[in-house]
Amino acid sequence: MVKDGAVVDRGVNLAAEYCERLDLAILVSGLGLEVAALVFDMVASGKALHIWSMGDLLHDAIAFLKVCLLDGIVPLLDMDAECELAQVIFNTGLPLHNRLRTLLESALAATNSVPAITAQHALCEEDIVPLVYASMSVMFCSTTLLSNGVDSNLFESIRRSSQALLRSVFELHADQRTWILEEILASLVKLPAQKRAQSVHRVAGGKSV
């Protein structure tokens, strides 16, 4: 019993340490997204024209948005709710949930700012590709963990914003349309679908196509 008790205590300590690190990572990511949104707004408004390195800043902001969505937020929300890691993360109390909500709010602000840039500036392929994959990762996220306390309406707003972003890229960059369509179709065929009505299927947790 003493040994088992020690194992339990060690597990609790490891879980607490992991959540502390996750909390810090979420905080830093949220701050980075706020900076990215600021860069997007400055570029869209023309206030950044006098900054000689703004092209590099814009590229870095787009890359950061892609990493946060594709490699951070989406994998976190796509985890199986029954897995041990998910239980460790989402059973630590309200503070972490609040931090996640703040991160999602920052992601929404950043994604909302990008379409204005794509409409006004000719982005290079190096920037278009990460924007497309960032948008698609959100659109096809199953969000199985949103029922554990993270605001599902907030993430749905991010999903709609990502769709608008992808639509703007698709409309303005004809030379990129073929591979974008191929990636969308490849993502669709991986999702479970249930036919509800003629020519209408439900995929990705209830999304209609």
Language-model regions, residue ranges each:
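Eukaryotic alpha-helical solenoid repeat scaffolds
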Residues: 1-209
